[in-house]
Structure formats: C-alpha cells, structure tokens
Amino acid sequence: MTSPRKTHPLKKMINNSFIDLPTPSNISFWWNLGSLLGACLIIQITTGLFLAMHYTPDTQTAFSSVAHITRDVNHGWTIRYMHANGASMFFTCLFLHIGRGLYYGSFLSRETWNIGTILLLTTMATAFMGYVLPWGQMSLWGATVITNLLSAIPYIGSNLVEWVWGGFSVDKATLTRFFTFHFVLPFIIAALATIHLLFLHETGSNNPSGMTSNPDKITFHPYYTIKDILGLILLLLLLMSLTLFMPDLLTDPDNYTLANPLSTPPHIKPEWYFLFAYAILRSIPNKLGGVLALVLSILVLMIIPTTHLSNQQSMTFRPITQIMFWMLTANLLTLTWIGGQPVEYPFIIIGQIASIMYFLIITTLIPLSALIENKLLKW
C-alpha cells in the first residue's frame, strides 16, 4: 500500500518539498542558510505577534508601551530583545545566503534569484518600518531622513512625501501606517518565500562544483533535515547569547531617548545591516543621484545573471573571479564601517571610492575576470 504522505493532497506537497525531495549529495553548510532564514522568519513573526499585543502605535504612548513591555510584561524583555536581535540574525543569514548564491552561481536560476532580490527589498522595508515603532530619537529622525528621500523624485516628490507621512511631518499618522505595514509585510515575505521555493524546486538545488548533480542525488530527509537542525541549534545559540548577555550590542543608545522633533541627534544612522546602502547614499552629493545609487545598490543584483560570461557556473575553479568576490566582500565591510562614521574627511573620500568600487566590481571586474579565465582555459 502506498504511504498517505505520497497520495494525500496536502501531505504530498510537504513530502515533495521537505521529505522525498531529491537533493545533491555534496551540498555544504552554505546551503543551510535557506532553512535558517525560514526559522528567522518564524521567530520574527511569533515574537512580533506577542509584542503587538502590548504595543500601542501612538506618538504619545508608543515609547512608554515599549518600556512597559520590557519592565512589566512577563518575559517581555526576552521577547523584545529576541525580536530586535532576531532582525540582525535575519540579515546576517540573508547576506551570507546572497554571498553563497553569488559564489556558486545560483543566480543562473533567474526566477529564483529575482524573487530573492524582491524578498531582500521587502525585508529591508519591513525592518526599516519596525525601527520606527519604538519612537525613540533615532526612530523619528531615521524615518524623517529616509522618507524625505522621496522628495528627490521630480514633480511629484514633495506631494509623495506628505502622502507617505499623512501630514506635514513624521507624526501619529505615519507611526500608525508604519505599524500596519510592519505587521502585514512579514506575511507577504512568507508568501514570496513559498514562491521562491516553488521556483527552486523546479530546477533543483545547485551544488559547490557547479556541475549537474542529477546522477547523484539523495532524499532531503533524513540527511539534510539533521544537517539543518544542527544549523538551527547554532543560530539559536548565537541569538540567545546576544539576547541574554548583550541585548543592546547592536542597537543605538539614542533610541532610549524619547523622540523629540525639536532636537536632532548629532549622527543619524540606521541599523548596522543598512549601513552599506546608507554609505552609498551619502557618498553622492546630489540628492536624486544618491537615491538612485541607493536603489541600484540592491537592484544591481538583478543584472548579475546577464553579466555572467564565464563558461563555468561556480567560482570554485576560478581563482581570478574569487579574488574579485573577496574584494567585493571587503568593499561591503568597508561601506558598512563608513556608514557609521560622521560625514567628514577622510570618511567622505573612502566612502566615495568604496561606492564606485562596489558597482565597478559587480558590473565590470567580475565579467572581465570571467573572460580572462575563459581565454586562459581556451574554452
């Protein structure tokens, strides 16, 4: 008799996606990040749901409601810090996941890659709106600075900013709508992640060698479920260590001061995971140019499948391109550092050079390296 998991309509879907899924036998721990991102999303939705039960999206009470969660709600501080540091874990896994895709040529599955880019943008929007909710100084001024970027759009810019604000400044209406979107977007992310998986399972997973793995595949369960559980344990260990021992390591002290529209903080900066994009935005003196560079810093990922000129999929056997990849990694770390520094010499010039290098490596140097390697291998 055939097992119900192979015949039952619902069980069959789960079976084909997580149990009997044919998986390459040689995929490394870099392929764990997808399941870790799923775990992060579940943690964020769960903790966020409990926080929403006690939070009030009103300029008069938002700050004190967060203080109330931390002080008076049973284990409220744990939930709050798990949610705040969970976002850092989420973005760490996201960046590593994208890096893995770049290194091993996973971007050649175009639909999966493009939906992944949309997922990144949606996650960034969600995190930005979430940062506004505690209504501290950095929440208010971060929201003011970033939403003000829309005014760079010709003709409709200023009207668009006021439409987003729901008034003439970031106020109660803005906070309410940001809370609404922050609550809804994670479910949209979950839906997009399902489509991401759907397209991935059409082609199957890539592997470190970049060669076809059709002759040598194994079932996802138990081999990779066990491997994913180990990754999950390590993720939870890191998250709980941050939450319990250093909850404020990655947050801004300014956000413990109630939002005051009459006092501007000396340095307005976003959370660490946005600093690379913020550095690119600040490196261009022109407002519209900066906004375009900011948007392109993420959208540039979508052109990577087109600029792939190598005859090999993966970077495993391509030393010149590997050097370019690690240059890009170092460059992104430099941008992250610059984004947190004040706008003065020498940080301005370092940021400008790093911004140029970021686009140059992705659009020119990596494709050029591929052509050189093709020539050397006489392919």
From Swiss-Prot:
The keyword Lyase does not apply. It is found in: Mitochondrion inner membrane. Keywords: Electron transport, Heme, Iron, Membrane, Metal-binding, Mitochondrion, Mitochondrion inner membrane, Respiratory chain, Transmembrane, Transmembrane helix, Transport, Ubiquinone. One of its GO terms (molecular function) is metal ion binding. A ubiquinone binds at residue 201. It is a multi-pass membrane protein. GO terms for cellular component: mitochondrial inner membrane; respiratory chain complex III. InterPro entries: Cyt_b/b6_C, Cyt_b/b6_C_sf, Cyt_b/b6_N, Cytb/b6-like_sf, Cytochrome_b, Cytochrome_b_C_euk/bac, Cytochrome_b_N_euk/bac, Di-haem_cyt_TM. The cytochrome bc1 complex contains 11 subunits: 3 respiratory subunits (MT-CYB, CYC1 and UQCRFS1), 2 core proteins (UQCRC1 and UQCRC2) and 6 low-molecular weight proteins (UQCRH/QCR6, UQCRB/QCR7, UQCRQ/QCR8, UQCR10/QCR9, UQCR11/QCR10 and a cleavage product of UQCRFS1). This cytochrome bc1 complex then forms a dimer. This is Cytochrome b. It comes from Saimiri boliviensis boliviensis (Bolivian squirrel monkey). The lineage of its organism: Eukaryota, Metazoa, Chordata, Craniata, Vertebrata. The gene is MT-CYB.
